[in-house]
UniProtKB/Swiss-Prot annotation:
Belongs to the PdxS/SNZ family. GO terms for cellular component: phagocytic vesicle. This is Probable pyridoxal 5'-phosphate synthase subunit pdx1. It is an enzyme of class 4 (lyase). It comes from the Eukaryota. Pathway: Cofactor biosynthesis; pyridoxal 5'-phosphate biosynthesis. Its EC number is 4.3.3.6. It comes from Dictyostelium discoideum (Social amoeba).
C-alpha cells in the first residue's frame, strides 16, 4: 500500500487534494442515513447536504444482528435517482471489492465503516486507488492520520451508531482536539517521537501542527439524535454532522431532520437551537452505551487496527 506523501497532501492538483476538496463542499452540513427513496427525499427537503444509503439503519443492525454487508446496489441506485444531493454508501472495513462495486455504480462518497461487519482484520482499503472520496471513522488523532495516509478524504468520529447516545462521539471529538492542541508546542524532535508513538506518518503530523486541525474535514457521527446534540458537536469544532437512527427512529422524522439542519447552521445561537428543539415528537428510545457488551460485538467504536 502506498501511503499518502507530503507532496500529495499539499499539492492542489493531486488526486487526494481533489477528493478532499469534494468533501470540503459538505462542510457545515448534515448527512442523514436513509433506507428508502422516500426517506432520501425527506432528508433532501429538510436541507441535508448528502444522504447515506443503507438497507438497515444502525439501530436495526444492532437489533437484528448477523453479518452486516454493503447494501444492494439496486437499492442504492434507486436512492441516487430520487435525490439531487450527493449519495454515500457503506462498505465493510477492508472489503475493496465492495468499494469497487460502489465506485462502478456511481456513488459520490464511500464510507469504510465499522458499523458493518469487518471483512479484513489486518488491512483497511487502499483508498488512494479509487477515484471516489472515502470517509473513515476515528477515535483519536493516530487513527485519523492513519486513515488519511491510506487516502481517506474525510474523517468522522466513530461514536456509537444506532444508540442515540452521543457520549462516545463527544469522547472521540475531544480526544482528537486534545492531541492536536498537544502537538502545537512540540519541537521537531518531539514531533518525530510523537508520530512514532501514535503510529502516524510524520509528514501528516507536521501538517496538523501547521494547520492546527486535521488536513481534511472532520464530521461528528455516532449517537447524534437531537438538535442539541448536533449543536454541541459543532461547538466542539466538528465540520458537520452525520445523523442516522436519530431521525427515522423518532416520532416526527421530517420535523426533526429540519431541526437538526437548523441547529448545525446556527450552532452558536442558543435562541434558534431552543426554538427548533420544540415539539419534535418523541426522540428515539436509544441505548445507554454503558450497557453494551464487547463480547456481543456491539461496541462498534472499539473496532480498529
Amino acid at each position: 500500500m502506498e501511503n499518502l506523501t507530503e507532496n500529495q497532501a499539499t499539492n492542489n492538483n493531486s488526486p487526494f487534494r481533489i477528493k478532499s476538496s469534494l468533501a470540503q463542499m459538505l462542510k457545515g452540513g448534515v448527512i442523514m442515513d436513509v433506507v428508502t427513496p422516500e426517506q432520501a427525499r425527506i432528508a433532501e427537503e429538510a436541507g441535508a447536504c448528502a444522504v447515506m444509503a443503507l438497507e438497515k439503519i444502525p439501530a436495526d443492525i444492532r437489533h437484528f444482528g448477523g453479518v452486516a454487508r454493503m447494501s444492494d446496489p439496486g437499492m442504492i441506485k434507486e436512492i441516487m435517482n430520487a435525490v439531487t444531493i450527493p449519495v454515500m454508501a457503506k462498505v465493510r472495513i477492508g472489503h475493496f471489492v465492495e468499494a469497487q462495486i460502489l465506485q462502478e455504480i456511481g456513488v459520490d462518497y464511500i464510507d469504510e465503516s465499522e458499523v458493518l461487519t469487518i471483512a479484513d482484520n489486518e488491512n483497511h482499503i487502499d483508498k488512494s486507488e479509487f477515484k471516489v472520496p472515502f470517509v473513515c471513522g476515528c477515535r483519536n488523532l493516530g487513527e485519523a492520520l492513519r486513515r488519511i495516509s491510506e487516502g481517506a478524504a474525510m474523517i468522522r468520529t466513530k461514536g456509537e451508531a444506532g444508540t442515540g447516545d452521543v457520549v462516545e462521539a463527544v469522547r472521540h471529538a475531544r480526544a482528537v482536539n486534545k492531541e492536536i492542541k498537544k502537538i502545537q508546542n512540540m519541537d521537531p524532535h518531539e514531533l518525530y517521537t510523537y508520530a512514532k508513538e501514535i503510529q502516524a506518518p510524520l509528514e501528516l503530523v507536521k501538517e496538523v501542527k501547521r494547520l492546527g486541525r486535521l488536513p481534511v474535514v472532520n464530521f461528528a457521527a455516532g449517537g447524534v439524535a437531537t438538535p442539541a446534540d448536533a449543536a454541541m458537536m459543532m461547538q466542539l469544532g466538528m465540520d458537520g454532522v452525520f445523523v442516522g437512527s436519530g431521525i427515522f427512529k423518532s416520532g416526527d422524522p421530517a420535523k426533526r431532520a429540519k431541526a437538526i439542519v437548523q441547529a448545525v447552521t446556527h450552532f452558536n445561537n442558543p435562541q434558534i437551537v431552543a426554538k427548533v428543539s420544540e415539539n419534535l415528537g418523541e426522540a428515539m428510545v436509544g441505548i445507554n452505551v454503558d450497557t453494551l457488551k464487547d463480547k456481543e460485538n456491539q461496541n462498534w467504536s472499539t473496532k480498529e487496527k
